[in-house]
Amino acid sequence: MLLNMNLQELKQKYNYDVATKMMQQYLDIKFAHLDCLLLFRMGDFYEMFYEDAILASNVLGIALTKRGKNGEEEIAMCGVPYHALENYLTKLIEANYKVAICDQLETPEEAKNRGGYKAVVTRDVTRIITPGTIIEENLIASAEPNYLASLVIPKNKETASLCYVDLSTSEIVVVNVPETEILNELARLKPREILLSENLRSSNLADSIFKQLNFRITYQVDSFFAINKCEKIILDFYKMKDIKGIGEISSSQICAIGSVLEYLSLTQKQNIPHLPIPRIIKFHSYMTIDFSTRRNLEIVTNSQGGSQGSLLSTLNHTVTKQGGRLLYNFLSSPLTNIAKINHRLNITEFFYSNLEIVKKIRELLKKTSDIERCLTRITMNRSSGRDLLSIKYTLETATIIKGVFFDAYGFNLPDFIEKIIKPLSGDAELYNLIDETIREDAPNNLNDGGIIKHEYHPKVAQLHDLINNGKLYIEKLKDQYRKETGIDSLKISHNNVIGLFIDITAKNVNKILDPKFIHRQTTVNHVRYTTAELQKLESELVNAKTLVISLEKELYADICSQVIEKASYLRMLASSLSGLDVFCNFAYIADEYDYVKPEFTDDLSFDIVKGRHPVVEKALQRESKSFVYNDCHLSELERIWLITGPNMAGKSTFLRQNAIIAIIAQIGSFVPAKSAKIGVVDKIFSRIGAADDLIKGQSTFMAEMLETSAILAQSTKNSLIILDEVGRGTSTYDGVSIAWSVLEYIHDKLKCRCLFATHYHELTVMSNFLPALQNYTIAIEESGKDILFLHNIISGAADRSYGLHVAALAGLPASVINRAEQILLKFEKTSTGKGKNILSTESNNLSLFYLEPNKTTISSKLDKKFSTIDPDKLSPKEALELIYELKKLV
């Protein structure tokens, strides 16, 4: 509502003309930031007023008070202590609010000197915090990026441009994305905030970003993305004369980069960190994994959005924050270039062959710091001495790490390892700068003082000497004056009226002969004096704390500017350390969990021997259980495996594990298998176990069909498709028909690798006329009424779904199971016979079974229900649903 009001209307609403000067100052700043919660610094608190206060008190759970009146209404107010700001910011950002931080730009004393005792302290917004522009360690995840993205859709709409930046690490990248892949690319990046033109607010794209991905969108007017404006912003920011200095980029990429830089300028109030020139990447240089597949495979998060049980949590044994972020990026963006994949695998193999080196390096890496984010805080003037010390300790440790390699290999390291560790040589000049200037016990807050070593600057030493030894200097001066006057009882005292003074008894007044003693005050029994020397000492003592903090800030700023000059080197060092962490991590898990180096080919091979699901295997190990490994042999001649068998037997796990093995291999890691030979996968698609999406108005079947449609439209010959129970959400006949036609399309048109699990046993006959399709099933053992799932994939087809066995395992009452068995027996006696196709006209015309007529309504309903069911075709889910229906009828 406020955003739609003009300035005059706003002033009228808040009775601006009769408000106090301080409240007018608040309103002026609030009117300029209507889309933000305004935190207004007043002394030791950040205060909020009016609607902001009401909203914040609810979100933060703090007391709502009042301050004065707005006409007849009292002004709502709440506040938070300045030193606890980050704790409250976390809640506001998590609630998706933009927060404007308004700070005092001068002290109350400075305000009085400027405009008298009625002067209002100067305040202004120093930055705007949004989900995509956070740099505070406590507000962002340490082991994953925090991206702000700008998405620009050109008029032809065939290719969009996306620029994304992580302000906390100064990473900035731009990429062109096909229109059909926009959601998939956003799912890969998981940006905390997306800039989008206001013209797209009502578009299907914006709706999908918000509803399907649940990402925050910040809309900007269309002119925000204007090409001429954005080009000028880029040239000014990078101090260039020609946009070609960025590289070969399109007009829409210019708009994406420029809009990101402009947004950072607006939110950071010109205080943007030193960003490198944007890295231009090609969209097809990494594997496409759509958002549904990322969710189904639980790559970086589990199905609830947490980390436990995800592939990332299983593979992540990194020991540094930046290493954790790099692994996150690797898993989000597996490579598709064989040469680059093999380059990574060679690095992993080197460390796997040198596990003693790995052990030493991992211990040393634990002593390094997240210098990427330290550097960003330094460049944005939000650092502390501890950030500089972190850089110093990391420089020191880096040289020790390089020594580990030298001790083991001397000058005979492979070139690809030498390239990684080259930045570890350190920078003696930078190390010495920090070592000579910053105290080891430097505080977090510059205003506390004590950050600069005393010996670095004589004035700092002098001021700290005054602070620490002020009483001693007063005592020395007192002793000097006693000698000069001969008055042994002379004292130097202090009060709040005249400050420091020389105090003698009245009977000794005749001994004060030197004119340097200036009379200040006479009492009944005492006379008080001062001297220029005492006044100077007093002034120095009073101002020493303020002066030393001011001087230390100046020196600290100068030191930081020298550190910033080394930004490029520090980023290379951070990259080297994070790379070492990730590849040592790969070697560690390969050794710990018996992973093997995969081999890559340029054909459609997918030859996995004794493959395992890493997440499930780790969970079983915690229970002292073993994972049952399985082979998978896909090729040009055998591209599709049609897998039948009961639920709980391991079909879904088998499907997922092979997709995961492809992902792990293409990030450069060894894989959980005895051997692996893989033709590079350009895209992975999965459709596994979709739940009803009633909020979005989509049933299970509709969600399934939408996902399947997208898979068929976007897959290529080099893709890997895993499908589980396609067609299950509709009638049996419809489901079989859809699954049948989907398989034909994949076989005849796409000709890509596919694992297809189903309960529709009728589909197994397709192997008779689709040469690249083969039937596989899950091995089981039957003992009377009991079955044992062996979890082995074997050649052949299942002839039953074992739905009632699954229902029994689920804990249905024995009476229900027994009754279901009786009904199933009736089905089997009167069914069309095993092995016949459900699509045959005979099966459509035959009555399924006959029940003894009964005059009751229940019997009639049962008869009607059973007449529509073929028991051989029941999936476990359908059998379970049938049991519930029978229970209701009975």
UniProtKB/Swiss-Prot annotation:
Q: Which SMART domains match?
A: MUTSac (SM00534), MUTSd (SM00533)
Q: Which GO terms describe its biological process?
A: mismatch repair
Does the entry feature the keyword DNA repair, yes or no? yes
| Entry-linked Pfam families | MutS_I, MutS_II, MutS_III, MutS_IV, MutS_V
Q: Which InterPro entries does the record cross-reference, listed alphabetically?
A: DNA_mismatch_repair_MutS, DNA_mismatch_repair_MutS-lik_N, DNA_mismatch_repair_MutS/MSH, DNA_mismatch_repair_MutS_C, DNA_mismatch_repair_MutS_clamp, DNA_mismatch_repair_MutS_core, DNA_mismatch_repair_MutS_N, DNA_mismatch_repair_MutS_sf
Q: List residues binding ATP.
A: G645, P646, N647, M648, A649, G650, K651, S652
Q: NCBIfam families attached here?
A: mutS1, PRK05399.1
What function does this protein fulfil? This protein is involved in the repair of mismatches in DNA. It is possible that it carries out the mismatch recognition step. This protein has a weak ATPase activity.
Q: What is this protein called?
A: DNA mismatch repair protein MutS
Q: Which gene encodes it?
A: mutS
